[in-house]
């Protein structure tokens, strides 16, 4: 059998060259396709690191970002409070109170029907025994018992006892520092002492001597 070795060698060489050329072309084509994909897969692009301060990172659930922002703001506020002086803190607290809605603000005004304390009273001094002959008896509302000027004040608790009538000491079995004034609105009693007076004892004491005092006591 005759073999054409020359042509056989040439054909095999050309086949290998064609296969190598096709393989190199496909490799280059795959490389051109893969490079852009690899760039897209890298976060931040080639040669740059991912920014950690993004509002919505790619690997974080968007529903959790709002809570993280609130926590960061609270931490910043705490740091600012620790660095600020007491005067600045008071000023900032006042500004926050002004920004509160009206229903959330604490009402500093007194509610209606708030009891007030008498700070000063002017009365005409008349002895209690002068009411003994009064036709009204224990319900005496004689004009010399009326007060001509009553100033009520809720900010002062000091009584002006010099202008009031002192009860005679012989009316009481117990020596209590009691004083009273009789006005058109009724008879008012108080004690010039810092110690608390028993209300029940005071009421019983006044009821025993109601006949010698103006106004209805019991």
Curated annotation (Swiss-Prot):
Keywords: Developmental protein, Differentiation, Neurogenesis, Notch signaling pathway. It comes from the Eukaryota. Pfam families: ESM4. Changing residue 12 to T: In strain: NVIII-41. Transmembrane segments: none annotated. InterPro entries: Malpha/m4/m2 (IPR029686). Residues 1-30, 64-86, 137-164 are annotated as: Disordered. Residues 1-25, 147-163 have a biased composition (Low complexity). This is Enhancer of split M2 protein. It comes from Drosophila melanogaster.
């Amino acid at each position: 059998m005759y073999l054409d070795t020359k042509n056989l060698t040439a054909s095999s060489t050309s086949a290998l060259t064609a296969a190598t050329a096709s393989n190199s072309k496909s490799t280059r084509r795959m490389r051109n396709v893969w490079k852009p994909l690899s760039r897209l897969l890298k976060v931040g692009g080639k040669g740059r690191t991912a920014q950690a301060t993004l509002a919505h990172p790619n690997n974080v659930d968007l529903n959790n970002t709002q809570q993280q922002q609130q926590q960061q703001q609270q931490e910043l506020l705490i740091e600012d409070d620790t660095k600020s002086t007491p005067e600045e803190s008071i000023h900032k607290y006042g500004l926050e109170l002004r920004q509160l809605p009206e229903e959330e603000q604490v009402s500093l005004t007194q509610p209606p029907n708030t009891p007030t304390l008498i700070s000063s009273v002017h009365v005409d001094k008349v002895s209690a025994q002068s009411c003994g002959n009064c036709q009204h008896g224990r319900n005496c509302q004689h004009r010399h018992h009326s007060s001509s000027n009553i100033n009520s004040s809720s900010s002062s608790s000091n009584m002006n006892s010099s202008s009031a009538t002192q009860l005679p000491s012989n009316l009481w079995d117990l020596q209590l520092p009691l004083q009273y004034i009789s006005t058109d609105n009724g008879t008012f009693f108080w004690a010039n002492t810092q110690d608390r007076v028993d209300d029940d004892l005071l009421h019983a004491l006044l009821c025993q001597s109601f006949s010698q005092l103006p106004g209805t006591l019991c």
